């Protein structure tokens, strides 16, 4: 499974991340409320994410953190991580990520 797209929609004032894969699965994550200005910060990571395996959340997040993931971008990175965990859970056929284990 590989990431084929990353999009951000501003719903109200809330950035909502959508990560799409070649397996027709989508993962969703959201940043903090009232931070629509995070959209370009989230999209900054798109070139890195394309082609990555979203089920390997820890490895992907390590790569993101090497590209800069601290303030003011922390919320942007968290939204991406939420979407990756959402995908990991869907790929495992469950509503929870497999790493949680319950």
Predicted regions and their residues:
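Metal- or metallocofactor-binding catalytic centers and their adjacent structured scaffolds
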Residues: 20-95
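Flexible hinge/switch segments at interdomain interfaces of large molecular machines
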Residues: 99-102
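Structured beta-strand/loop patches that form or line metal/cofactor-binding pockets in enzymes
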Residues: 1-29
């Amino acid at each position: 499974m590989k990431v084929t797209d990353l999009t951000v929609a501003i719903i109200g004032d809330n950035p909502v991340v959508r990560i799409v894969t070649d397996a027709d699965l989508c993962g969703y994550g959201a940043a903090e409320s009232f931070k629509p200005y995070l959209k370009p910060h989230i999209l900054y990571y798109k070139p890195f994410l394309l082609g990555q395996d979203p089920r390997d959340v820890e490895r992907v997040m390590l790569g993101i953190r090497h590209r800069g993931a601290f303030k003011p971008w922390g919320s942007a990175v968290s939204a991406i991580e939420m979407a990756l965990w959402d995908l990991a859970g869907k790929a495992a056929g469950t509503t929870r990520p497999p790493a949680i284990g319950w």
